[in-house]
Protein backbone atom coordinates (compact mmCIF):
# COMPACT_ATOMS: atom_id res chain seq x y z
CA UNK A 1 0.00 0.00 0.00
CA UNK A 2 1.41 3.36 -0.94
CA UNK A 3 1.30 5.92 1.88
CA UNK A 4 1.70 8.90 -0.41
CA UNK A 5 -0.83 9.48 -3.14
CA UNK A 6 -0.84 12.24 -5.71
CA UNK A 7 -4.34 13.16 -6.88
CA UNK A 8 -4.82 14.67 -10.30
CA UNK A 9 -8.34 16.08 -10.63
CA UNK A 10 -10.06 16.81 -13.92
CA UNK A 11 -13.05 19.13 -13.75
CA UNK A 12 -15.94 18.79 -16.15
CA UNK A 13 -19.57 19.86 -16.49
CA UNK A 14 -22.34 17.70 -17.81
CA UNK A 15 -24.19 20.72 -19.18
CA UNK A 16 -27.53 19.32 -18.12
CA UNK A 17 -29.06 22.69 -17.21
CA UNK A 18 -29.54 22.25 -13.47
CA UNK A 19 -29.58 25.80 -12.11
CA UNK A 20 -28.58 27.49 -15.37
CA UNK A 21 -29.79 31.08 -15.73
CA UNK A 22 -32.91 31.55 -17.80
CA UNK A 23 -31.01 33.95 -20.02
CA UNK A 24 -29.05 31.09 -21.55
CA UNK A 25 -30.08 29.98 -25.02
CA UNK A 26 -32.98 27.54 -25.09
CA UNK A 27 -30.92 24.92 -26.89
CA UNK A 28 -28.10 25.03 -24.33
CA UNK A 29 -28.71 21.44 -23.28
CA UNK A 30 -30.75 20.22 -26.27
CA UNK A 31 -29.14 16.90 -27.12
CA UNK A 32 -30.89 16.79 -30.48
CA UNK A 33 -28.73 19.76 -31.50
CA UNK A 34 -25.43 19.15 -29.71
CA UNK A 35 -24.68 15.48 -30.16
CA UNK A 36 -24.78 14.84 -33.89
CA UNK A 37 -27.91 13.73 -35.69
CA UNK A 38 -26.94 10.08 -36.23
CA UNK A 39 -25.84 9.51 -32.64
CA UNK A 40 -28.91 11.25 -31.26
CA UNK A 41 -31.27 9.27 -33.48
CA UNK A 42 -29.64 6.01 -32.41
CA UNK A 43 -30.14 7.01 -28.78
CA UNK A 44 -33.78 7.90 -29.38
CA UNK A 45 -34.36 4.61 -31.22
CA UNK A 46 -32.97 2.65 -28.28
CA UNK A 47 -34.59 4.66 -25.51
CA UNK A 48 -37.71 2.53 -25.06
CA UNK A 49 -35.56 -0.52 -24.26
CA UNK A 50 -33.01 1.39 -22.20
CA UNK A 51 -35.61 3.18 -20.07
CA UNK A 52 -37.04 -0.19 -19.02
CA UNK A 53 -33.67 -1.79 -18.24
CA UNK A 54 -33.17 -1.56 -14.48
CA UNK A 55 -30.39 -4.18 -14.44
CA UNK A 56 -27.35 -2.19 -15.53
CA UNK A 57 -24.16 -2.61 -13.54
CA UNK A 58 -22.69 0.10 -11.31
CA UNK A 59 -18.97 0.10 -10.46
CA UNK A 60 -17.68 1.98 -7.41
CA UNK A 61 -14.18 2.24 -5.92
CA UNK A 62 -13.36 -0.24 -3.19
CA UNK A 63 -12.01 0.38 0.30
CA UNK A 64 -8.56 0.71 -1.28
CA UNK A 65 -7.01 0.37 -4.71
CA UNK A 66 -6.92 -3.44 -4.47
CA UNK A 67 -10.73 -3.66 -4.35
CA UNK A 68 -13.60 -2.91 -6.72
CA UNK A 69 -17.32 -2.90 -5.91
CA UNK A 70 -20.14 -4.02 -8.20
CA UNK A 71 -23.89 -3.49 -7.79
CA UNK A 72 -26.84 -4.32 -10.02
CA UNK A 73 -30.48 -5.36 -10.05
CA UNK A 74 -31.66 -8.71 -11.39
CA UNK A 75 -35.24 -9.45 -12.36
CA UNK A 76 -36.85 -12.15 -10.21
CA UNK A 77 -38.96 -13.37 -13.13
CA UNK A 78 -35.71 -14.46 -14.79
CA UNK A 79 -34.75 -16.66 -11.83
CA UNK A 80 -33.24 -16.40 -8.37
CA UNK A 81 -30.60 -13.74 -7.84
CA UNK A 82 -27.00 -14.89 -8.26
CA UNK A 83 -24.70 -12.21 -6.84
CA UNK A 84 -21.53 -13.36 -8.58
CA UNK A 85 -18.83 -11.47 -10.49
CA UNK A 86 -16.38 -13.46 -12.61
CA UNK A 87 -13.08 -11.57 -12.65
CA UNK A 88 -9.47 -12.14 -13.69
CA UNK A 89 -6.65 -11.53 -16.15
CA UNK A 90 -7.51 -14.49 -18.39
CA UNK A 91 -10.86 -13.82 -20.02
CA UNK A 92 -11.29 -17.54 -20.59
CA UNK A 93 -10.62 -18.46 -16.96
CA UNK A 94 -12.29 -15.93 -14.68
CA UNK A 95 -12.54 -16.49 -10.92
CA UNK A 96 -15.94 -16.15 -9.21
CA UNK A 97 -16.43 -13.61 -6.44
CA UNK A 98 -19.65 -14.04 -4.50
CA UNK A 99 -21.58 -11.32 -2.70
CA UNK A 100 -25.02 -10.68 -1.26
CA UNK A 101 -28.50 -10.09 -2.60
CA UNK A 102 -31.91 -9.12 -1.26
CA UNK A 103 -35.29 -7.99 -2.50
CA UNK A 104 -35.86 -4.51 -3.91
CA UNK A 105 -39.01 -2.66 -2.85
CA UNK A 106 -41.28 -3.32 -5.82
CA UNK A 107 -42.86 0.12 -5.50
CA UNK A 108 -39.61 1.43 -6.97
CA UNK A 109 -39.76 -0.83 -10.02
CA UNK A 110 -43.30 -0.48 -11.35
CA UNK A 111 -44.57 -3.34 -9.20
CA UNK A 112 -42.16 -5.87 -10.70
CA UNK A 113 -39.97 -7.97 -8.43
CA UNK A 114 -36.22 -7.32 -8.56
CA UNK A 115 -33.29 -8.21 -6.32
CA UNK A 116 -30.21 -6.13 -5.74
CA UNK A 117 -26.76 -7.74 -5.97
CA UNK A 118 -23.61 -6.45 -4.24
CA UNK A 119 -20.15 -7.94 -4.84
CA UNK A 120 -16.65 -6.79 -3.89
CA UNK A 121 -13.70 -8.05 -5.93
CA UNK A 122 -10.38 -8.14 -4.06
CA UNK A 123 -6.71 -8.71 -4.82
CA UNK A 124 -6.30 -6.26 -7.70
CA UNK A 125 -2.74 -5.46 -8.78
CA UNK A 126 -1.35 -2.23 -10.22
CA UNK A 127 -1.06 -1.65 -13.98
CA UNK A 128 -3.07 -4.74 -14.85
CA UNK A 129 -5.84 -5.38 -17.34
CA UNK A 130 -8.71 -7.49 -16.03
CA UNK A 131 -11.82 -8.97 -17.58
CA UNK A 132 -15.15 -9.50 -15.89
CA UNK A 133 -18.73 -10.62 -16.25
CA UNK A 134 -21.59 -10.43 -13.77
CA UNK A 135 -24.38 -12.92 -13.28
CA UNK A 136 -27.98 -11.82 -13.69
CA UNK A 137 -30.17 -14.65 -12.41
CA UNK A 138 -27.55 -17.20 -13.40
CA UNK A 139 -26.78 -15.76 -16.83
CA UNK A 140 -23.41 -14.11 -17.37
CA UNK A 141 -23.20 -10.78 -19.14
CA UNK A 142 -20.77 -10.22 -21.98
CA UNK A 143 -17.12 -9.75 -21.03
CA UNK A 144 -16.02 -6.24 -20.05
CA UNK A 145 -12.53 -4.86 -19.47
CA UNK A 146 -11.16 -3.03 -16.44
CA UNK A 147 -7.59 -1.69 -16.12
CA UNK A 148 -5.88 -0.54 -12.93
CA UNK A 149 -3.41 2.34 -12.64
CA UNK A 150 -0.05 2.48 -10.93
CA UNK A 151 -1.38 2.75 -7.32
CA UNK A 152 1.02 5.63 -6.62
CA UNK A 153 -1.12 8.34 -8.15
CA UNK A 154 -4.76 8.69 -9.08
CA UNK A 155 -6.30 10.58 -11.96
CA UNK A 156 -9.84 11.56 -11.01
CA UNK A 157 -12.67 12.97 -13.09
CA UNK A 158 -14.82 15.30 -10.98
CA UNK A 159 -18.37 15.91 -12.19
CA UNK A 160 -21.29 17.85 -10.79
CA UNK A 161 -24.99 17.23 -11.18
CA UNK A 162 -25.43 14.67 -13.94
CA UNK A 163 -29.06 15.08 -12.77
CA UNK A 164 -30.74 12.93 -15.40
CA UNK A 165 -34.19 14.40 -16.00
CA UNK A 166 -33.37 18.00 -15.01
CA UNK A 167 -34.11 19.39 -18.47
CA UNK A 168 -37.86 18.99 -18.04
CA UNK A 169 -39.76 21.98 -19.38
CA UNK A 170 -37.08 22.84 -21.90
CA UNK A 171 -37.93 23.05 -25.62
CA UNK A 172 -36.96 20.34 -28.08
CA UNK A 173 -38.22 20.05 -31.65
CA UNK A 174 -41.20 22.29 -30.97
CA UNK A 175 -42.27 20.48 -27.78
CA UNK A 176 -41.40 20.65 -24.10
CA UNK A 177 -39.36 17.91 -22.49
CA UNK A 178 -41.39 16.11 -19.83
CA UNK A 179 -40.58 13.97 -16.79
CA UNK A 180 -43.31 11.37 -17.24
CA UNK A 181 -42.69 7.76 -16.27
CA UNK A 182 -40.70 5.21 -18.24
CA UNK A 183 -39.79 5.89 -21.85
CA UNK A 184 -42.17 8.87 -21.81
CA UNK A 185 -39.60 10.69 -19.66
CA UNK A 186 -38.15 12.68 -22.55
CA UNK A 187 -36.15 14.85 -20.15
CA UNK A 188 -34.28 11.75 -18.96
CA UNK A 189 -33.80 10.69 -22.58
CA UNK A 190 -32.24 14.06 -23.39
CA UNK A 191 -30.02 14.18 -20.32
CA UNK A 192 -28.93 10.56 -20.50
CA UNK A 193 -27.57 11.20 -23.99
CA UNK A 194 -25.76 14.34 -22.81
CA UNK A 195 -24.23 12.42 -19.87
CA UNK A 196 -23.08 9.63 -22.17
CA UNK A 197 -21.53 12.14 -24.56
CA UNK A 198 -19.88 14.05 -21.72
CA UNK A 199 -18.16 10.91 -20.45
CA UNK A 200 -17.07 9.91 -23.95
CA UNK A 201 -15.43 13.31 -24.44
CA UNK A 202 -13.92 13.41 -20.95
CA UNK A 203 -12.36 9.94 -21.22
CA UNK A 204 -11.03 10.65 -24.71
CA UNK A 205 -9.37 13.85 -23.50
CA UNK A 206 -8.10 12.28 -20.28
CA UNK A 207 -6.93 8.71 -20.90
CA UNK A 208 -5.92 6.77 -17.83
CA UNK A 209 -8.66 7.96 -15.51
CA UNK A 210 -8.88 5.84 -12.36
CA UNK A 211 -12.34 6.80 -11.19
CA UNK A 212 -14.98 9.52 -11.11
CA UNK A 213 -16.21 11.59 -8.18
CA UNK A 214 -19.77 12.80 -8.66
CA UNK A 215 -20.68 15.69 -6.35
CA UNK A 216 -24.32 14.64 -6.13
CA UNK A 217 -27.69 14.70 -7.89
CA UNK A 218 -27.17 11.74 -10.16
CA UNK A 219 -30.88 11.94 -11.03
CA UNK A 220 -33.45 14.71 -10.85
CA UNK A 221 -36.73 13.33 -9.56
CA UNK A 222 -37.13 14.01 -5.85
CA UNK A 223 -39.27 11.83 -3.63
CA UNK A 224 -40.58 9.50 -6.34
CA UNK A 225 -39.22 6.37 -7.95
CA UNK A 226 -37.77 7.16 -11.36
CA UNK A 227 -35.75 4.13 -12.39
CA UNK A 228 -35.58 5.32 -16.00
CA UNK A 229 -33.46 8.23 -14.77
CA UNK A 230 -31.03 5.80 -13.15
CA UNK A 231 -31.13 3.74 -16.35
CA UNK A 232 -30.01 6.82 -18.27
CA UNK A 233 -27.37 7.57 -15.66
CA UNK A 234 -25.85 4.07 -15.78
CA UNK A 235 -26.10 3.68 -19.57
CA UNK A 236 -22.77 5.14 -20.77
CA UNK A 237 -20.33 2.55 -22.09
CA UNK A 238 -17.54 4.42 -20.28
CA UNK A 239 -18.98 3.33 -16.92
CA UNK A 240 -18.31 -0.34 -17.67
CA UNK A 241 -14.64 0.34 -16.92
CA UNK A 242 -14.74 3.53 -14.85
CA UNK A 243 -15.93 3.37 -11.21
CA UNK A 244 -17.87 6.30 -9.76
CA UNK A 245 -17.79 7.46 -6.15
CA UNK A 246 -21.10 9.26 -5.71
CA UNK A 247 -22.18 11.86 -3.19
CA UNK A 248 -25.84 11.88 -2.18
CA UNK A 249 -27.29 15.18 -3.41
CA UNK A 250 -30.52 16.83 -2.35
CA UNK A 251 -32.37 15.25 -5.27
CA UNK A 252 -30.94 11.81 -4.50
CA UNK A 253 -31.54 12.05 -0.75
CA UNK A 254 -35.33 11.99 -0.95
CA UNK A 255 -35.44 9.26 -3.56
CA UNK A 256 -35.78 5.72 -2.13
CA UNK A 257 -34.13 4.25 -5.25
Where are these regions (language model features)?
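Bacterial Sec-dependent N-terminal signal peptides
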Residues: 1-10
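Generic signature of intrinsically disordered, low-complexity, basic-rich segments
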Residues: 4, 18-19, 98
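Sec/Tat signal peptide C-region and signal peptidase I cleavage site
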Residues: 21-25
Amino acid sequence: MQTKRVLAGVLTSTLLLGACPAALAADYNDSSLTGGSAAWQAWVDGWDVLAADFTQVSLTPGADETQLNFAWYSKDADGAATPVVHFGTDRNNLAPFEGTSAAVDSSLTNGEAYSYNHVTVTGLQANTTYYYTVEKSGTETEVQTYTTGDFESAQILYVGDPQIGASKGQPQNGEELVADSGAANTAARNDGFAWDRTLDIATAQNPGLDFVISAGDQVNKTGQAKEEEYAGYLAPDALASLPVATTIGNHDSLNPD
